[in-house]
Amino acid sequence: MKTVTVKDLVIGTGAPKIIVSLMAKDIARVKSEALAYREADFDILEWRVDHYADLSNVESVMAAAKILRETMPEKPLLFTFRSAKEGGEQAISTEAYIALNRAAIDSGLVDMIDLELFTGDDQVKETVAYAHAHDVKVVMSNHDFHKTPEAEEIIARLRKMQSFDADIPKIALMPQSTSDVLTLLTATLEMQEQYADRPIITMSMAKTGVISRLAGEVFGSAATFGAVKKASAPGQISVNDLRTVLTILHQA
């Protein structure tokens, strides 16, 4: 299986990498939170752009991205607009969503973009090609904050992302029971052992699913999300606790 290298970070080998999400509403908060995040122990900074109020002003968005890049130049920067239908803060049109991601790619400020699988097949394929032409990696994602589908469906979605040339397929699902967590872990393991030729990220959300955020190295998830301050999804634990557990499991 091939790994994915972003800056000096190799994703897909060793302990799962820690991603943290910064969710600031304006440029002043972007600056202050970036300074606070700089002291935390994590591997990838995700900027959740859907929390940013001045979204229609592309210059403002990119000015904020520049602050993040300059504050933490060594950290891979993942640019993520999470759509309302997949648990995000704002709803925008597909056209605006694609344009925003293209602007991020054009800026040269971001290392990775998050692209939702169900945006539309043609738009997704074109945006992946555009990102790769500009040396930007793509985390292709799907989120369901209500339920966990069958393992076959989870695997089908991850394989579809892989077929669309995502650098890292990602899926996050809400368990309604403990057995749903096992379904997610079973699907992750089967994907990893039978189909994946690149790193994948999977997680089961909420308190019930926390084990999935810790056991990635065992089952085949290459990264996990932790919280510096406010969690960006239910079930995230603090980065310091997360690093401790990931290290224990890695060294066992």
From Swiss-Prot:
Record-listed E.C. numbers: 4.2.1.10
Keyword Lyase: yes
The keyword Lyase is annotated on this UniProt entry: yes
Signal sequence, start to end: none
Catalytic activity, as annotated: 3-dehydroquinate = 3-dehydroshikimate + H2O
SUPFAM superfamilies in the cross-refs: Aldolase
CDD domains: DHQase_I (cd00502)
Pathway field: Metabolic intermediate biosynthesis; chorismate biosynthesis; chorismate from D-erythrose 4-phosphate and phosphoenolpyruvate: step 3/7
MF (Gene Ontology): 3-dehydroquinate dehydratase activity
UniProt-annotated catalytic positions: 143 (proton donor/acceptor), 170 (schiff-base intermediate with substrate)
UniProt GO BP: 3,4-dihydroxybenzoate biosynthetic process; amino acid biosynthetic process; aromatic amino acid family biosynthetic process; chorismate biosynthetic process
Binding site for 3-dehydroquinate: 21, 46-48, 82, 213, 232, 236
Keywords in alphabetical order: Amino-acid biosynthesis, Aromatic amino acid biosynthesis, Lyase, Schiff base
Enzyme's top EC category: lyase
Xref: Gene3D superfamilies: Aldolase class I
Cited HAMAP family: AroD (MF_00214)
Subunit and partners: Homodimer.
Role, per record: Involved in the third step of the chorismate pathway, which leads to the biosynthesis of aromatic amino acids. Catalyzes the cis-dehydration of 3-dehydroquinate (DHQ) and introduces the first double bond of the aromatic ring to yield 3-dehydroshikimate.
Protein family (similarity comment): Belongs to the type-I 3-dehydroquinase family.
Protein name per the record: 3-dehydroquinate dehydratase
Record organism: Escherichia coli O139:H28 (strain E24377A / ETEC)
Gene: aroD
